Amino acid sequence: MADFNSVFTSLANVNGWMTRDQAQRLWDRAGELPAGSTVVEIGSFQGRSMCVLASSAAPGVTLYAIDPHGGNDRGPQELDGFAEEAESDHQIFLANLANAGVRDRVTYLRKYANDATNDVTSQLDLLYVDGAHRFKPASQDIRQWGARVKDGGRLLVHDSFSSIGVTLALVVLTFFSSQWIYEGRSQSMAQFRRGPNTLAARCGSLARQLAQLPYFALNLVYKVLLALKLKPVAKALGSTGEWPY
């Protein structure tokens, strides 16, 4: 079986916004699932994260990748009008899965997430949301697909405490939730566990999420400075010079 370091190294030329720490979290969560489990990824882009999930998951784990590759919400500041690039992303996605040796393991649904609910009939053990970052679609993905996660299952959300839309979706859906407990994050990838929870657990979850708001505010400052081409100022404040993920 492949190990994490070799898989991550092999993805060096695969485009995407997943850091090493985030890839490790995906690897660990997928790798702990037993045969018969179901994993759904919303927002696959060129396959960087799905290659990690599928390489780590045990035989018998079912994996779905949902992405319309339609040219909207393609990436940072690429909200619409990228149909030609998206078709290229679609082809590259399939090629990257094949190159990683996991193409046959992944059921690819070229659809918007809200149109794919009937294609996945089982409950979910792991849900990874990295789709559109605006509030409405982000909250729809988390609400609609999060309801399919089993008690004890995990939800991972990319661009948490980084994107305004995604963070607002978390405020509405997870901060005060009786179902979702915040367990931590790898940069902007937040992890939640689903299940009935005590009041004490819910209060602790809320407190931990509130504690991430200074990180969120700093990310917004970085984004403004980078958009204004003020990288030196952003770096002086601690930015690596890259868009914060």
Which residues make up each language-model segment?
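S-adenosylmethionine/decaboxylated-SAM
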Residues: 2-20, 24-245
